[in-house]
Amino acid sequence: MFINQIGGYRMQTDLIQELTEDEMPLFPLEVVLFPGGVLPLHIFEQRYRLMIQYCLDNDRLFGIVLIKKGREVGEHAEPYLVGTAVKIIEVDQLEDGRMNLITLGQHRFKITKIRRDLPYLVGQVRALEADDTEPPEDAEMPGVRAIQLYRTYESLLAELSPQWKVVEEIPTALDHLSYQIATRLQIPLTDKQQLIETVSIHQLLGREIELLERENRRLKISLLARRSFEKHDTNISPWKNASLN
C-alpha cells in the first residue's frame, strides 16, 4: 500500500480513491455561495491543496459550506449542513504549490454524514433541489414583485455606495432569480444560510421579497438622511471663522 506524505499529512493514497458518488470533499468558509455564483479561491493550506488536486485528477465537485463553529484555518471547523457544490473552471498552480482557482456554483446539497478520517472533511450528501422552479399560472406575481424590489435595491445601493456596481442582467427564471437576489443581498451570513436552506423556490422568493422590502426601507431612510445633511451648507457653520486663540 503506497503511503503519500504531503505537507506533514501522511495518508493512504488509495483511501482517497474510495470516495463514493454520494460523497463530496468539503471546504468550510466564511461565505454562503449560491448556484450560479462565482467564487475565486486562493488555496494555500496543504490539506486543501491535496483536496483540490484530488478534484482535478478525478473531475469531482467539492462543496462550499458556511462555518458554524471554528475557523477557516487550522483545526477542522464544524460546517452548516447545507451548501453549494462547485466546479473548478479555472486553476493557476503556482511554483510553491499554492493555487488560485475560479469556481462556479452548481447545485445545493445537504450533508447527511461527515467523514473526518482524511486531512479535509468529506460529506455524504444528497442534492437539495426544489421541484417548483416553474411557477403555476397564479404564481407569476411574486417573480414580478421580486424583480421590482430588486431593481430598487440595486439602485439605492448604487446611490449610497458609488463603488457598488448595479447588476446588468436580471434572470426571469424563478430559481436563477432567487439565487442571484440571495447572492447580492447585503445581509448577515446567518441570514443567507437560512435562505440557502429554504428548499422551495417559491418560499425562498417570498422570503427574499420580505428582506428586500425591509432593506429598501432602511436604505431609503439612509438616503433621505444623507440628502438632508447635504442640504445644510457646512460652510455657514458658526465655527467657520471662529478662533480658539
Regions from the language model: what does each represent?
Residues 2-245:
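N-terminal low-complexity, acidic/polar interaction/targeting segments
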